[in-house]
Amino acid sequence: MDKYELVKDIGAGNFGVARLMRVKNSKELVAMKYIERGPKIDENVAREIINHRSLRHPNIIRFKEVVLTPTHIAIAMEYAAGGELFERICSAGRFSEDEARYFFQQLISGVSYCHAMQICHRDLKLENTLLDGSPAPRLKICDFGYSKSSLLHSMPKSTVGTPAYIAPEVLSRGEYDGKMADVWSCGVTLYVMLVGAYPFEDQEDPKNFKKTIQRIMAVKYKIPDYVHISQDCKHLLSRIFVTNSNKRITIGDIKKHPWFLKNLPRELTEIAQAAYFRKENPTFSLQSVEEIMKIVEEAKTPARVSRSIGAFGWGGGEDAEGKEEDAEEEVEEVEEEEDEEDEYDKTVKQVHASMGEVRVS
């Protein structure tokens, strides 16, 4: 960790804390995601790191390295200065059709690459799509904590993901094609960009999970009258929001759809993208899989001394104590978020119990 210096805290989530760090020698900024050593270091963490390491594409956040500290495992990755796509939509309310298409084209490009690498994301959402700091922002997919690789694992069975983005077959709790579930989530992302609301939530009762799930299973959505979009766009959404995943449009066919192809940037064309699909392409990370797995195994051993994330000793100085207090507050917030998520999981189970076994026709 000596090669990095702390710049600022940039967020907290169920995983732990994220910080903006600077490489001392090169002055390069990186995002560092910290996960506490011990029981939190499970197969999901290992899978996220190994899957992320294998990906090399301009629409995917670059993995750099994993580092072990006395208290945490730290995952260093590319820093996206433009923040979340979610924040951009919150500021704008909703996007024009052209702007939504611009970001959707990049999203599909990144997801298509993941699928070609036999990795399905399983938690695609606006909060997991970041933007770089350029004037015409480049979209970057991040957070591979739930992703599954068909090269390493069996078919996904667990119900993961954010409620509003979950495909019907995932709610059915049987085996499902993770790639087709990703297509559904991409459709939800497109809808939110166009409308500024989630397609299957009751706007007057958004926290009613039972109603949301019923609407997802019935594919009950509509484009509000105040949103004016082309017939091609409506057609694409209707091909994505299909209950039976076998009849849903594939990523390959989305890339051939007239709406997708309109104003497609040259770097996203099939010819330009071919360069990223070469098997001999090196990864961004110099760490081998063996080195990474060794660090992950070590991280399963809890820290001997309980120490806040602010006590890592970067930057020191007069404000170190204040930073430690801030970090402790962040950890408390994370714990609260985890409690909320646990509550949601309970609610989903209750919904399933009240609805009986949900089936996809």
From Swiss-Prot:
E.C. code: 2.7.11.1
Binding-site list for ATP: I10, G11, A12, G13, N14, F15, G16, V17, A18, K33
Catalytic reactions on record: L-seryl-[protein] + ATP = O-phospho-L-seryl-[protein] + ADP + H(+); L-threonyl-[protein] + ATP = O-phospho-L-threonyl-[protein] + ADP + H(+)
InterPro entries: Kinase-like_dom_sf, Prot_kinase_dom, Protein_kinase_ATP_BS, Ser/Thr_kinase_AS
Location of the region described as Disordered in the Swiss-Prot/TrEMBL record: 311-361
Acidic residues compositional bias, start-end: 318-344
UniProt-annotated catalytic positions: D123
Pfam families: Pkinase
Positions bearing Phosphoserine: S154
Residues passing through the membrane, by range: none
Induction field: By salt and osmotic stress (at protein level).
Domain Protein kinase: 4-260
GO BP of this protein: lateral root development; response to osmotic stress; response to salt stress
GO MF annotation, one: ATP binding
CDD domains attached to this UniProt entry: STKc_SnRK2
Tissue: Expressed in seedlings.
Keywords tagged on the record: ATP-binding, Kinase, Nucleotide-binding, Phosphoprotein, Serine/threonine-protein kinase, Transferase
Gene Ontology CC: one annotated term: nucleus
Family indicated by similarity: Belongs to the protein kinase superfamily. Ser/Thr protein kinase family.
Protein name per Swiss-Prot or TrEMBL: Serine/threonine-protein kinase SRK2B
Taxonomic lineage from the root: Eukaryota, Viridiplantae, Streptophyta, Embryophyta, Tracheophyta
The encoding gene: SRK2B
